[in-house]
Amino acid sequence: MNRCKGRNSSFLKKERQKINFISQDMGCLVSKPADSGGNRRRPGNIGEVYVYVPGLRIPKPVDFSLTLGDHLSKNIVERLSALRTRIVVMAGQEGPTITRTRRKTATQHGGSTLADLQQALEDYLPVLLGLVKDGNQLQHKVQFAWINQEDDLEETAMSNAWYEVLSVLHLMAMLSLSQANLLLLPRTSADGYQPKLSEESRRASIDIFVKAAGYLDCAVRHVLPQLPAEFRRNLPVDLAEGVLRALCLQALGQGVDIQLGMAIDSTKATLAVKRRLACEMVKYWQQAQDNIMNLPLSNGWGEKHRLFVKWKYIEAKAAAYYYHGLILDEGNTEKSHGMAVAALQAADEYLKESKKACEAFNSATPLSRNPPLFGTMKYLSEKIPKDASSKVRINRDLYSFEKIVETAPTLPDFALALKPDEFQLPGVDPSWNEENINRGQVGSKQLKSDQR
């Protein structure tokens, strides 16, 4: 196999026994096996989880001066270096602990840490995009390396700036989901009794979910297509199209979950509104599951991600069948009452299954636990068993879970209303315009000198 060319060849030679790489015409891809040790730090316990974040990919240092020093001005090289180094340091320090959702951390430090790192990424992105503007050939000069979380390979490096853009958007989305998780952990009320979640926090979380979905949607529609097919095939599973789509749908599904909880608390929301939200939630989670079903999510973070989606999909079906059953029960025919009973029984069974799925998720490494119930599931965990038992007159012990689900009426199909934020890649930083002007002046002077 051919070796990647460039100034880092001596390093690659030293590392050849533990690094596999694939030569590309436009750059090189480097993947370090999971057992090579060292960089990937995983917590044994991530505490309370309402929004699952499958770890944070951490960037490794890059020396821009080595690869770009002969091609760009000192100003641009130093800006790229300073902005990315800031991210490397912050992500390296906070990444392994940022998913630790201790309530103290969430209220005193977590928010500012997330916001600072998010701002650092937003500052870096416009400058980074100068490397890919108008097919800039410099996009293949720098090898960008990131530590993976869901992939079996510990790290992946590619000599393509679009890979760096993709990694930045993914990290921005994961930080947003982390922020939503911290926001949705109920705080102990002033009277010291039942933990509560404010209306303001719930509304803010929906905005964050939509924003996270926007980053991921942009990554899938506008960044992935920029990578050559060979690069896309060799992306870590963290950045696979299926995982990106699943995370986008997960964010929207959890946003609708919050909307449903708010509808439950509202005296103005009708049963029809609640059923529609619950049925939409089922579709989001079903599509999320379809996207990751056949992906190699086998290690800790990846397997836990799969279990989270499975749990939330089952939980959503419990909610949808419950509200569908209540509406069917409003009918005046014997058939509608029979269908209502079947729907409520299915809701009860799905609720039981969701509790098993929840236990499987929390017991998978890294370990986690549920925050105090609130919103949708707090209400439904009390109402479903009660309403199902009052409506169901048959001996449910005679029926298996599979039989009950088979006889349940079909859920209505609604168009999905909650959409990702229309995030667009920012314009290239103005410093690149100055760079082009300066380069043009240098080229003009050189041409006149040659003509003499």
List each model region and its residues:
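Acidic, Ser/Thr-rich intrinsically disordered and amphipathic helical segments
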Residues: 82, 116, 123, 172, ...
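Alpha-helical solenoid scaffolds
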Residues: 119, 161-164, 203, 207, ...
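Extended ligand-binding groove/face enriched in aromatic
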Residues: 138-175, 218-226
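Amphipathic alpha-helical repeat scaffolds of TPR domains
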Residues: 166-187, 243-261, 312, 316-326
